[in-house]
UniProtKB/Swiss-Prot annotation:
This is Leucine-rich repeat extensin-like protein 1. Residues 382-744 are annotated as: Contains the Ser-Pro(4) repeats. Residues 1-26 form the signal peptide. The keyword Protein biosynthesis does not apply. It comes from Arabidopsis thaliana (Mouse-ear cress). Glycans are attached at residues 71, 77, 253, 318, 344. Residues 704-729 have a biased composition (Pro residues). InterPro entries: Leu-rich_rpt, LRR_dom_sf, LRR_extensin-like_regulator, LRR_N_plant-typ. It holds the Pfam family LRRNT_2. Hydroxylated on proline residues in the S-P-P-P-P repeat. O-glycosylated on hydroxyprolines. It is found in: Secreted, Cell wall. Keywords: Cell wall, Cell wall biogenesis/degradation, Developmental protein, Glycoprotein, Hydroxylation, Leucine-rich repeat, Repeat, Secreted, Signal. Residues 408-445, 518-537, 555-576, 658-744 are annotated as: Disordered.
Length: 744
């Protein structure tokens, strides 16, 4: 019989052995549950079981990538997964002595493929950034194992299907960027019951209205623009006053009246509802939005008199109410008294102002007052929002910068940690730089809009030292929000210091200047032959998270995703050359949206074209944008349109030769560009297939340029790394891909 001490020791040893056995068995069960067919070489030695699982996940994903033009995954071999390009490791939050894969940043890699289900093995992942690639299919359900995932950026790819509900099961998620994809159907109401800080769903195919519990969300930035939502703006919007800084609902086919509850949004700096079908008067409660800097209500059917309280807002910088049916404005709103405010009130029914509607239009049904109670919209309030534990820090997003100007600069070649902007991803620089995000789709400069430009101070210059390590923890730093020069709409958050993998994310600094946010529909993207999955330019990387111990991933989020690199296409827009992409025959300035032959007037029949000139060849004048529509409106028709073309040279879909330098293009016969307005909007162009299979020839679908970037980053990318990544176009969210073409 064993003595009591020996028996206790024996039982303890047995228990410890059982726990270790169960852990090892669980690891192998995870692998078998995911159906991985990766055979791990027995000669490979791994630092710990977590990195062994990461090896299986990344090797499975590598097999699911059909095209890697910059050989970004070339060094994804061997057991040292922490040295793989785009992979960042950090100490586990649960076991600090154990290194795990904490971040993935493949922004602007121009890869084509799909997301392997084995990625669910990366259960310690805190950030996943793959914007501005050509990944297609659907988001695997196995992502529900990523309990620490804080930032998810899938923008500017070719994902399809309904809203990926797996994101609703991620308990730590704070930043969600699904812009510029082909998601469709309803926006789930549960999304607004989650404790998210930023939601970007613009430029998809969502329909069936905005959920009535919208006001339950504690987000600081909400962008649902360029879908086909329809319906009313919920009255519950008034419940978002404590956190909301920016709301963009433009070009969503919204109807009804503007709910008076918007007066509760006292922290909102940017409010944009242009290009919808809203009616009735502007509520006088708008005068309570004390922080308002940008108010855009153009291209609707508003009537009545402009409330005087709007023109008394002390922070107002841009008030655009053109293309409505307003019948009057108070004397205080006269342009002479608003010298410091950009005001555009053309195409209304205001007596005494220039460029107003005709008497016939001003006596039409649309110009008559409406009874807003008949719409039955904003009287419905959703139940009180769930109580969220807000981090002590004050979150304030800098107002987006509407820059009606040229697209952002081309991405740099080196890969830097994800830079997040509400716009296209920033250019990668060093292996590990703080993630910077910018949120503003840099559309080409457009003529018809008052130049309200808002820029946030660019992030500080990169420090020579490597980025701080990922730290999994600590509450998110307070949002720092400053508005410097007017260039782009940039929300940049400082790079996460140590990657802190824990609940609160690192402080969000919404400040790096992203590409200009332009309200305009992007020109039809030039079709390009993508790999097995539809090809599209990569969006900006978006990243803001809790400090982490290893070097933080790339820069932070951006409103509109940007660009990728690829061969020069015959697109009608001139984009700055992108690093690593072959230079086009010669830069050609195409008219923004017009692909069809212009009017008979200036017709030049090119004699250089290989094929006989069509009946009326087009002479594309230099940079001259197509004539603005009758009324200065930010956005094109109500139909949402796909992401604007990114500043990338896309190879033409057809084998036709590249256009000669002096571009006198013959009509459609010679160049592949689609006819006018052949821009596929979310509601019009057929969504890509739900799955992309290797071996299938790429389909010539119009490539969507990366959306503009809102950079959530506040710190510049880290210094160039000692080890260089394969050439890869990267655009910091501040320099997101080319903005979508302006709708003017």
């Amino acid at each position: 019989m064993l003595f009591p001490p020996l028996r206790s020791l024996f039982l303890f040893t047995l228990l410890l052995s059982s726990v270790c056995f169960l852990q090892i068995k669980a690891d192998h069960d995870d692998e078998s549950d995911l159906g991985s067919d990766i055979k791990v070489d027995k000669r490979l030695k791994f630092e710990n079981p977590k990195l062994r699982q990461a090896y299986i996940a990344l090797q499975s994903w590598k097999k699911a990538i059909f095209s890697d033009p910059f050989n970004f995954t070339a060094n994804w071999n061997g057991s040292d997964v922490c040295s793989y390009n785009g992979i960042y490791c950090a100490p586990s939050p649960s076991y600090p002595k154990t290194r795990v894969v904490a971040g993935i940043d493949l922004n602007h890699a121009d890869m084509a493929g799909y997301l392997a289900s084995e990625l669910g093995l990366l259960s310690d992942l805190a950030l996943f950034h793959i914007n501005s690639n050509r990944f297609c299919g659907e988001v695997p359900l196995t992502f529900n194992r990523m309990k620490l995932l804080y930032e998810l950026d899938l923008s500017n790819n070719r994902f399809v299907g309904k809203f990926p509900k797996v994101v609703l099961s991620l308990p730590s998620l704070k930043f969600l960027d699904l812009r510029y994809n082909e998601f469709e159907g309803k926006i789930p109401s549960k999304l607004f019951d989650r404790e998210l800080d930023a939601i970007f769903l613009n430029h998809n195919r969502f329909r069936f209205g905005i959920p009535k519990n919208m006001g339950n969300s504690p987000v600081s930035a909400l962008v649902l623009a360029d879908n086909n939502l329809g319906g009313c703006i919920p009255g519950s919007i008034g419940q978002m006053g404590k956190t909301l800084n920016e709301l963009i609902l433009s070009n969503d086919n919204l109807t009804g009246c503007l709910p008076p509850q918007i007066g509760n949004l006292k922290k909102v700096t940017v409010f944009d509802i242009t290009s919808n079908r809203l009616q009735g008067p502007l509520p006088s409660s708008v005068g309570n939005m004390k922080s308002l800097e940008e108010l855009h209500v153009a291209n609707n059917a508003f009537t009545g008199v402009i409330p005087p309280s709007i023109c008394q807002l002390s922070n107002l910088e841009n008030f655009t109410y053109s293309s409505n049916y307003f019948s009057g404005r108070p004397p205080i709103c006269a342009a002479s008294l608003l010298a410091d405010i950009v005001v555009n009130g053309t195409m209304n029914c205001i007596t005494g102002l220039a460029r107003q509607r005709s008497d016939k239009q001003c006596s039409s049904l649309l110009a008559r007052p409406v009874d807003c109670s008949k719409f039955g919209c904003y009287n419905i309030f959703s139940p009180p929002p769930p109580t969220f534990k807000m981090s002590p820090e004050v979150r304030t997003l800098p107002p987006p910068i509407y820059v009606y100007s040229s697209p952002p600069p081309p991405p740099s070649s080196k890969m830097s940690p994800t830079v997040r902007a509400y716009s296209p991803p920033p250019p990668p620089s060093s292996k590990m730089s703080p993630s910077v995000r910018a949120y503003s789709p840099p559309p080409p400069p457009y003529s018809k809009m008052s130049p309200s430009v808002r820029a946030y101070p660019p992030p500080p210059p990169p420090s020579p030292s490597p980025p701080p390590p990922y730290v999994y923890s600590s509450p998110p730093p307070p949002y720092v929000y400053s508005s410097p020069p007017p260039p782009p709409y940039v929300y940049s958050s400082p790079p996460p210091p140590p990657y802190v993998y824990s609940s609160p994310p690192p402080p969000y600094v919404y400040s790096s200047p992203p590409p200009p946010y332009v309200y305009s529909s992007p020109p039809p993207p030039p079709p390009s032959p993508p790999p097995p999955c539809p090809e599209s330019s990569p969006p900006p990387p978006v990243v803001y998270y809790a400090p982490v111990t290893q070097s933080p991933p790339p820069p932070s989020p951006v409103y509109y995703p940007p660009v990728t690199q690829s061969p020069p296409p015959p697109s009608p827009v001139y984009y700055p050359p992108v690093t690593n992409s072959p230079p086009p025959p010669s830069p050609v300035y195409y008219p923004p949206v017009t692909y069809s032959p212009p009017p008979p007037s200036p017709v030049y029949y090119p004699q250089v074209t290989p094929s006989p000139p069509p009946p009326s060849p087009l002479y594309y004048p230099p940079v001259t944008p197509s004539p603005p529509p009758p009324s200065p409106v930010y956005y094109p028709p109500v139909t949402p349109s796909p992401p604007p073309p990114s500043p990338v040279y896309y190879p033409p879909v057809t084998p036709s030769p590249p256009p000669p330098s002096p571009v006198y293009y013959p009509s459609e016969t010679q160049s592949p560009p689609p006819p006018t307005e052949y821009y596929y909007s979310p509601s019009q162009s057929p969504p890509p297939t739900k799955a992309c299979k290797e071996g299938h020839p790429p389909q010539a679908t119009p490539s969507y340029e990366p959306p503009p970037e809102y950079s959530y980053s506040s710190s510049p990318p880290p210094p160039s790394p000692t080890s260089y990544f394969p050439p890869m176009p990267s655009v910091s969210y501040d320099a997101s891909p080319p903005p979508p073409p302006s709708y003017y």
